[in-house]
Amino acid sequence: DKFAREAGMGFPGGPKIEKLAKGPELLDLPYSVKGMDMAFSGLMTAAKSKLDSGHSIETVTYSLQEHAFAMSCEVAERALAHTGKTELVLGGGVACNERLREMATIMTEERGVKCFIPSKDLCVDNGVMIGWLGHQMVSGNYEITDEDNRVHQKYRTDMVEVTWR
């Protein structure tokens, strides 16, 4: 979305970038992954610079998308390896992107782990995602005590007991 705004595409930028990302060549852009940390600021700045220097919007968006998703999949793969987890879930609006879905699916198949990608109508709205999770939890007879139903400052997603599968 940030690149799309700076390139004058407006909001939301993700779908517009995906539609344009058909460039014939992959430009050399910064790839910044350290452990499980990613930095996109240099990537965004370099992509805008490539656009400003005359590269086509299709080539720049293609290169930006490929780099950003390769970084994300690398970090996800590393997280799976370090934690021993056997499942990856994509979520949020970016999970609507077909290229990210493809890259995540390839990575998880190569690792022998499961990849869960909700239908696109469940990815575009945070309220819908939260509501769907609530539905799954209630349908799976998930119960929570008043004591557990409060804010936990250091709560981790891997602390959730998944009972609805």
Residue ranges of predicted features:
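Residues at alpha-helix caps and immediate loop-helix transition turns in enzyme cores, especially N-
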Residues: 43, 100, 127-130
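Glycine-rich phosphate-binding/hydrolytic loop that grips phosphoryl groups
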Residues: 118-162
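Glycine-rich phosphate-binding loops at beta-strand->alpha-helix junctions
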Residues: 85-104
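Short glycine/serine/threonine/alanine-rich loop segments
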Residues: 9, 85, 113
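A short helix-loop
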Residues: 1-55, 106, 136-154
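Buried hydrophobic packing segments
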Residues: 3-4, 76, 130-135
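Conserved phosphate-binding/catalytic loops in two-lobed NTP-binding clefts
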Residues: 88, 105-129
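Adenine-nucleotide phosphate-binding core of ATP-dependent small-molecule kinases
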Residues: 35-41, 46-89
